[in-house]
């Protein structure tokens, strides 16, 4: 599964032989990507809001890596995330039942620093705990503003997250804790 906003990412995944399920919120981009990849049977473009979508169900529905409707196969997530949704989307993916082997994302450098921050540093906070509880996080490379058009004012970083195997079992415990806190 991947965010579809960076066309070079789509092309690189296809060249590597990947089956791609691209999730895009913007209807105009969905139409353009559908047209661009109409002759590529290994690409499915889905018009959806990744923050509000059951990603495991989406993967099962579109038969990525197997027969439509079959159990979702283990997958990789690759995205150049809009900076405004980075934190909630990473937590959404890690809290989902999506069988993720690895998540590779490009994020704002300051967010990357928060994702890998050790306890006791100023970068360490709620996002750090939420993500590190569910995944091992590694920095994979820094990306300068000059590679983008138009160039942003911030640097980006490629981050790789390896979801912890025990995260799915922990989700049930986590849900019970949330329910207890909500009850007051």
Residue ranges and their predicted role:
Residues 1-183:
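Catalytic cores of RNA-modifying enzymes
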